[in-house]
Amino acid sequence: MNDRCFGRMMAMAAIVALVALTPLPAAGQEVPWYKIVHSRCPGEPGKFHPCALEKAKTFNPPRTPDRKPDMQGHWIGGPESSQDIEEHPESFGIPANPTLIVDPADGKIPYQPWAAAEKQKNFKEYQDPQGQCFPSGVPRQMYVPFGFQILQTPGHVVIAFEHNHASRIIPTDGRPHVGKNIRLWEMDSRGRWEGDTLVVDVTNSNGRPWLDAQGNFFSAALHVVERLTMVDTDTIHYDATIEDPQVYTRPWKIAFPIRRNKQPDHEQIEYACHEGERDEQHIGSLGYKTYPGVVPPQ
């Protein structure tokens, strides 16, 4: 086994350890997330997506004082797809998962030819930025398997994540995006309500995060449109349309269920990433570099 292969195994093992430390709900956790039924809808994204959208049509959600759907509370972290957004078998202790991609139908990211080769290069040469404690970015932060809390005020929705102390402050008051020359790890989010659906327009990426630990990537031209719709009091249907004409051949979509954390004594833990961290030094010493982002061919 060469050093490069060993380094990748070390990286995977480190992430397995992090996942093992994640606080999990007491009931039903041995059941894979995609086999849990939500409002009589299968949890697997390809089946949950159309079923949940249909269920949401007849659900009247609880309301905030300003009559918006009340999504506040603690929610269980997204599906365990931060390792690989596409379908994959169990490997190095990482559980098997179905693809999060519901469009196109084959569940694959529709890369341009040069970008498909670039993805392979990323996996072979660079450390996962999230593994180096950089922000996960959008949409990855939504399917990292750590919990988060949603808070709402008139004109804002706030998502406070347990993972890496990240937070998203989403104005819903109609203000424009920040200037196009401002480039951010977590991008710039602007929300609006379309009926009972929170629609979030996300722009201004710096092109540095990955979609998962496999090197799946985007450029600074990334544009994401997220839609969050309550299916019942304890389930949110999440979908995101992902567009980057410099990297992909077409827009594509992911979808999955978000479940409420119903533990009455739940608290989000203080997340430590850099403190006492040594794996980054070990992996870096084996030749894996910090990902610089990509400059698409002209």
Q: Language model features by range: what are they?
A:
Residues N2-A13:
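Bacterial N-terminal signal peptides that target proteins for export
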